[in-house]
Amino acid sequence: MSSIDPATFAAQFAQIEIQPFKQRYQLQTNTYQSQLSALGKVESAMREFRTALNEMNSSTNSIIKNSTSISQEGYFTANADAKALSGSYQIFVEQVATSHQVSTGMPADLDATTEIPKTGNLEFTINGKTMTIDLSTVDTDGDGVTTVSDLTKAINNNSDNPGVNATLVRSNGQTHFMLSSTETGVANQINVSATGTGQAWFEDAFTNLSQISAPQDAVIWLGAEKTGLKLTNSSNTFEGVIDGVDITVTKAQTSGETAIGLGIGADDEATKEQLNKFVDAYNTLISTIDEHTQIGSEDKKRGVLASDPTMRSIESQLSSLVRGEHGGMRLSEIGVTLDRHGKLKVDQEKFAEAQKNNSAGLEAMFNGDGALLDSMDAMAEPFLKFSSGAFKSRKEALQANLDRLSDKQTTLERKYDMSYKRYLKQFTQMNTLMTQMNQTMSMFG
């Protein structure tokens, strides 16, 4: 009668006891991990889709694109948004807006270390806003000396600064204390006075200002000079002078010159590109969802999220929005429809016709509050909230399941250890008994 290996037998018998549970727990773990991974991929795809929506639905960007053409470059630029209507205009640039720049009447031997009074106030008023510099607070480094350099920092860094920059400029061997308004236009003229310092040279310096650049507004004529509509603006950018069009002037024309032509029209290619971006973003999201929710067939594996209610809700809401009415129109009316796979396809000829005949209607359908892109963004938000979104809740639930399975597997390992020790003891005893029997039998051999 041959002996046995107690350790091998103990391991085999202990493994048999836990094997059904081990296989079940591992299968469940694999399922939950696959679902967790799939949810992460869908969530990522949905965030990318939402980013694309926001990029096409902002104050500076939309689905519908218009373009501008200018007959003579160098005097102004123009930007037309989706609301702009096609048309031709004449623009004459009389003057550009400039900011106010002055040089103070500081002494000729001024430099950055020149000391200034430690008492009194320096007051600035620009466009109705006032800033008062208390000269006793200008010495921020605490060295007991207040310098012109300290004053420039105090002016520029003051939280109440109404729009003025102070700089020290060196020219022809002399340092000048300069003040410049940060905004253009007559309204942004710099008014400054120094009082209570007890030092006339300092107060006179802010009374005797040398003007380097006068503040002026931008002036254009919508039409010919002197006979068209005169428009004045403190900034060089005239926003919405023509509905949906911003004009930025860069150089003044000479009086008597001919007005410059401005043309506004639909940018068919840019609009087509934007529409295709929207369609591609939508279809990419649907493809990602479909990859993980497919029912399964002979040649396709069932998706790990095939019965997931969150996925069904997303697809249902997206489909409803695509088929719904927005701004009095439906996507199907302009050649954008769903195919049998739930993805968007575009009839380019039908869309081009809609763009030609009703660009304003297209803009109202796609962009703006409550329009299609805004509605899709609002639909996605509850799913993607970092604190309480549906994806977060689903992933937390799956992770909780994985944690419970991990605890069960730990318990199973303890059970294996206990069974192994029990079987090892039993098989060791059996092996000892078999050895004794063999020895007894050999005595009669």
UniProtKB/Swiss-Prot annotation:
Plastid as UniProt keyword: no
Main location class: secreted
Coiled coil, from the record: 388-423
Gene3D superfamilies: 3.30.70.2120
Annotated GO biological process: bacterial-type flagellum-dependent cell motility; cell adhesion
Compartments (UniProt record): Secreted; Bacterial flagellum
GO cellular component, one term: bacterial-type flagellum filament cap
Superkingdom: Bacteria
Matches recorded under InterPro entries: Flagellin_hook_IN_motif, FliD, FliD_C, FliD_N
Keywords: Bacterial flagellum, Coiled coil, Secreted
Keyword Ligase: no
Signal peptide: none
Oligomer status and interactors: Homopentamer.
Entry similarity comment: Belongs to the FliD family.
Function as written in the Swiss-Prot or TrEMBL entry: Required for the morphogenesis and for the elongation of the flagellar filament by facilitating polymerization of the flagellin monomers at the tip of growing filament. Forms a capping structure, which prevents flagellin subunits (transported through the central channel of the flagellum) from leaking out without polymerization at the distal end. Essential for swarming motility.
Name under which the protein is recorded: Lateral flagellar hook-associated protein 2
Lineage, top ranks: Bacteria, Pseudomonadati, Pseudomonadota, Gammaproteobacteria, Vibrionales
